[in-house]
């Protein structure tokens, strides 16, 4: 067992201040603002009432974001001018858990427990769902040499948390946003006139930033490599075409070129695509379509 505190959020590099901001805004939403109240709990439960509660998995899966319980309850305690809860984590983020397994235990003011219950569960169920779904893809790719990547198809304002959950599930993060990596896509190529023109424009304006290029044909892939790109996103290619593209690129340069496949991938066929020799397969569904992992908070 370990204390569940904010240090747990640093294990895989999550920005704790970002997480605190998400929690603050989520509680403001649920309570009607920073000075709002839970009208039911405040009317029925004295601040001096103390209880213990357990976070329990209602389905098997992979856990992510357990420390958010501590962040939520700390924020609630501050709002209520109440003592903080004592919280213990019984499993670590990234762990596979069974239905019925107790994941964490908390003791302290009952009001704090109940006011923060739904906000914390909403966040942790969501992140654990992303981690669980990602683990399915990571397991499907095991031994192929390919890694599963996430995308920018995330819930607004939850990107850092959801990308953390992807890592907990064994996935790899791609770019965080529009600022850290350049991605030349079809509309950029159309606006600039060609793959090379678009690549050269970005490289000229931002000489130190990585420039990735989306391609749909072997010819585009070779043009991008000739322009200087060392990361290709092969969009909506069939497995045979993806394999042909990988072979052509590997034969065209001795430089290391990372190749990603995306579009229309399914768990049933992912190993077929991995066998083409790609480095990555990106799956938007990791963050835009993952069902939650059902968790509950039970008073004991």
Where are these regions (language model features)?
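Residue-level signal for the nucleotide or nucleotide-sugar donor/cofactor binding architecture
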Residues: 268
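Active-site loop ensemble at the mouth of alpha/beta enzyme cores that anchors a bound cofactor
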Residues: 296-300
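Conserved phosphotransfer cores of two-component systems
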Residues: 253
């Amino acid at each position: 067992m370990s204390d569940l505190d904010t240090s747990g959020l640093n294990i895989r590099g999550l920005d704790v201040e970002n997480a605190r901001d998400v929690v603050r805004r989520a509680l403001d939403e649920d309570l009607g603002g920073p000075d709002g109240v839970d009208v039911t709990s405040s009317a029925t439960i004295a601040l001096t009432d103390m209880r213990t509660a357990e976070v329990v998995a209602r389905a098997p899966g992979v856990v992510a974001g357990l420390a958010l319980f501590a962040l939520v309850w700390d924020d609630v305690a501050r709002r209520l001018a109440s003592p903080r809860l004592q919280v213990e984590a019984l499993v670590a983020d990234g762990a596979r858990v069974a239905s019925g397994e107790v994941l964490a235990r908390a003791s302290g003011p009952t009001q704090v427990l109940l006011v923060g219950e739904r906000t914390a569960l909403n966040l942790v169920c969501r992140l654990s769902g992303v981690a669980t779904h990602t683990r399915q893809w990571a397991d499907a790719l095991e031994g192929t040499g390919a890694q599963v990547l996430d995308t920018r198809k995330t819930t607004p304002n939850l990107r850092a948390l959801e990308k953390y959950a992807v890592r907990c599930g064994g996935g790899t993060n791609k770019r965080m946003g529009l600022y850290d990596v350049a991605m030349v896509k079809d509309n950029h190529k159309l606006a600039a006139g060609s793959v090379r023109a678009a690549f050269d424009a970005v490289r000229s304006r931002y000489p130190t930033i990585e420039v990735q290029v989306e391609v749909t044909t072997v010819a585009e892939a070779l043009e991008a490599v000739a322009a200087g790109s060392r990361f290709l996103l092969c969009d909506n290619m069939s497995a045979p075409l993806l394999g042909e593209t990988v072979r052509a690129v590997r034969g065209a340069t001795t430089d290391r070129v990372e190749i990603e496949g995306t579009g229309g991938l399914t768990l049933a066929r992912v190993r077929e695509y991995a066998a083409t020799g790609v480095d990555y397969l990106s799956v938007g569904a990791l963050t835009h379509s993952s069902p939650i992992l059902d968790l509950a908070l039970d008073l004991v």
